[in-house]
Every structure is written in structure tokens, then in C-alpha cells.
UniProtKB/Swiss-Prot annotation:
Catalytic activity, as annotated: tRNA(Phe) + L-phenylalanine + ATP = L-phenylalanyl-tRNA(Phe) + AMP + diphosphate + H(+)
Keywords, sorted A to Z: Aminoacyl-tRNA synthetase, ATP-binding, Cytoplasm, Ligase, Magnesium, Metal-binding, Nucleotide-binding, Protein biosynthesis
Enzyme Commission code: 6.1.1.20
Superkingdom classification of source: Bacteria
Residues the record lists as binding Mg(2+): E252
Assembly: Tetramer of two alpha and two beta subunits.
Species: Xanthomonas euvesicatoria pv. vesicatoria (strain 85-10)
Family: Belongs to the class-II aminoacyl-tRNA synthetase family. Phe-tRNA synthetase alpha subunit type 1 subfamily.
Record protein name field: Phenylalanine--tRNA ligase alpha subunit
Length: 331
């Protein structure tokens, strides 16, 4: 009994003197492990006379419980001290000056797109949206694109294996809108479009805005008036404009719109800014609208083109290179 008591006292002193978790773990193994001294005492109970076993067993169990509690308490003390030391080393000096948050800004293409949408909203046009992954019907067939049209070629259009494609224009939204609404109607579709083309003035992905008006009395004069008002409102000045005959499968007659753009040297040159025309009767028929009763006009423009003109950017690719030095100019 005195041997167990003496062993317990020495062990408790060693536990209290342990300075690291590793030292404490070594003591636990030496005392309570499979080959530990307390465990050895338990194994020797069978060699004692029967009348001594009960008292010796109780003493050994009390010793084991006391050591287990002491080990747990010392472990908690060491862990708390280590945490306090780490927190003291990581203490934040609240008197140091803070870092100001960087102020963000809208991308110039986003600014331009919102400006275009806002102008047409004032003219009574409703904004509509549609999928960027289209089917052949909405992207080509319903818009009077014949099967042999060059726009269907692989070098102009990104096709998927199942026959679907990345939309080459937002005109498919017009088809969906006419399917869901009855004339008279005014709408614009804005979003990303995709074509296999990349150079200083073209990108394989760009943003487009297309507009559509259908009613019983619309004519080309209405179209010219609408686009003249839009150009004046967007650039906040008057331009001399001309409408050149051009071919688009979904309009007849079709035209491209040029504005007299002043160069840095003071000279003026004609600059193409958008395409337009009267909606082709076949397009109206494809969505169940009677072309004998209704007429309409449509127009489309590249958002990046207008952003380049508004901000004086010469290379379209600068909009997509994510150079903060470039983008910060427009924030």
C-alpha cells in the first residue's frame, strides 16, 4: 500500500512539473500505458494473498483515477497557455491605419449597354431576353435564312453536336417575343452573341442590341425617325446620317446606317453604325402574324462598336483583356 502511495505522489509531482504536451504524453504512457507502472501494479494483484487483494485493488484504482484527472487538468493548462501565447503573438494593433476598400465601377460595355436600353425604354420599347444556346429554327429558319445562306457555315457559327448552336444574333429573341405577344408590339433584345471572328474590330463573343416594332401602320419613315432619335440621344449631338441599301434575309428592304463621324484631324468620314429594315413578310408568317395587315421594322447594333465610338477606343479587344489600368478610366 505504501508503495502505491509513494508511486502516486511521485507521479503527481512529475505531472505537475511537465512543461510540454509531449512530456505529458510520455508520462501518461509510463504510468497508464500497457507497460506502465500503474498497469503493472494491477497485473500483480493476482499474486497477493486473498485478504489483501481488495484493499490493494481499491488503492490502485484510486491512484489511477487521480493520475488520469491530473493528466487531463495539466493538459488543459498547457493547451490554454499555448493558446494565450499564440494570441499574444498575433495581437492586432488597432491603432494602425486601415486599408480602404477599392471602389469598383461598371465596365464600359455595361455602361454602354445600359445607356442604349435606357434610351429605347424612353421610346416605349420593352426589354426581352432569350437563351444564348439556340436551335436552328429560332436563329435561322424563322428569320428567313435559306439553307444555303453563308451565315449557316461552320466558319461563321459555333455548332454543338446535337444541332444546337451559339446564337449569332439576338434576333431569335424577337421570334420568341412575337410568338408570345400579339401586335402592336415594341421590344428590344440585348445580350451576348457569338461568331467565329476575331481581329482588331471583331470578337468571337460580343454584345448586340436588336429592336423590333410591329403594328398596322409602321413604315420606313418611322424607322428612320426612331434611329435618328436614338443616335442623337446616345451621342448627345446631331449627325448627318445616310441609309444605304443592304441585304439582310429577315428584312426587305434592308439598309445600313452611316453617320458622318468627325476625325481627330477635323475631317469627316462616313462610319457604319447599325443595320435595319422593314420586317420580311416571311418572318411575320413564321410566327403567325398576317403580313397583309401588319408591317414592322427591325434594327440591330453592336454594343462594343458604340462603346468604342463613345470612349475613343481603337481596339475592340481592349474591352476583354481585363487590364485594370484600362478599365479604371471608365470607373
Amino acid at each position: 500500500m505504501s508503495e502505491i502511495q509513494s508511486l502516486t505522489e511521485r507521479a503527481l509531482a512529475d505531472v505537475a512539473a511537465a512543461q510540454t504536451p509531449d512530456q505529458l504524453e510520455a508520462l501518461r504512457v509510463a504510468l497508464l500505458g500497457k507497460s506502465g507502472s500503474i498497469t503493472a501494479q494491477l497485473k500483480q494483484l493476482g499474486t497477493l494473498p486473498a485478504e489483501q487483494r481488495k484493499a490493494a485493488g481499491e488503492a490502485i484504482n484510486l491512484s489511477r483515477d487521480a493520475l488520469t484527472a491530473a493528466l487531463a487538468e495539466r493538459k488543459h493548462t498547457l493547451e490554454t497557455a499555448a493558446l494565450d501565447a499564440r494570441l499574444a503573438g498575433e495581437r492586432i494593433d488597432v491603432t494602425l491605419p486601415g486599408r480602404r476598400s477599392e471602389r469598383g465601377g461598371l465596365h464600359p460595355v455595361t455602361r454602354t449597354l445600359e445607356r442604349i436600353v435606357e434610351i429605347f425604354a424612353r421610346l416605349g420599347y420593352e426589354l426581352s431576353d432569350g437563351p444564348e444556346i439556340e436551335d436552328d429554327w429560332h436563329n435561322f429558319e424563322a428569320l428567313n435564312f435559306p439553307p444555303h445562306h453563308p451565315a449557316r457555315a461552320m466558319h461563321d457559327t459555333f455548332y454543338f453536336g446535337d444541332g444546337r448552336l451559339l446564337r449569332t444574333h439576338t434576333s431569335g429573341v424577337q421570334v420568341r417575343y412575337m410568338d408570345a405577344h400579339k401586335p402592336p408590339l415594341r421590344m428590344i433584345a440585348a445580350g451576348k452573341v457569338y461568331r467565329s471572328d476575331s481581329d482588331q474590330t471583331h470578337s468571337p463573343m460580343f454584345h448586340q442590341v436588336e429592336g423590333l416594332l410591329v403594328d398596322e401602320h409602321s413604315n420606313f419613315a418611322d424607322l428612320k425617325g426612331t434611329l435618328s432619335e436614338f443616335v442623337r440621344a446616345f451621342f448627345e449631338r446631331d449627325f448627318e446620317m445616310r441609309f444605304r441599301p443592304s441585304y439582310f434575309p429577315f428584312v426587305e428592304p434592308g439598309a445600313e446606317v452611316d453617320i458622318a463621324w468627325q476625325q481627330p484631324d477635323g475631317s469627316t468620314r462616313w462610319l457604319e453604325v447599325l443595320g435595319c429594315g422593314m420586317v420580311h413578310p416571311n418572318v411575320l408568317r413564321s410566327v403567325g402574324i398576317d403580313p397583309e395587315r401588319y408591317t414592322g421594322f427591325a434594327f440591330g447594333l453592336g454594343v462594343e462598336r458604340f462603346a468604342m465610338l463613345r470612349y475613343g477606343v481603337n481596339d475592340l479587344r481592349a474591352f476583354f483583356e481585363n487590364d485594370v489600368r484600362f478599365l479604371r478610366q471608365f470607373a
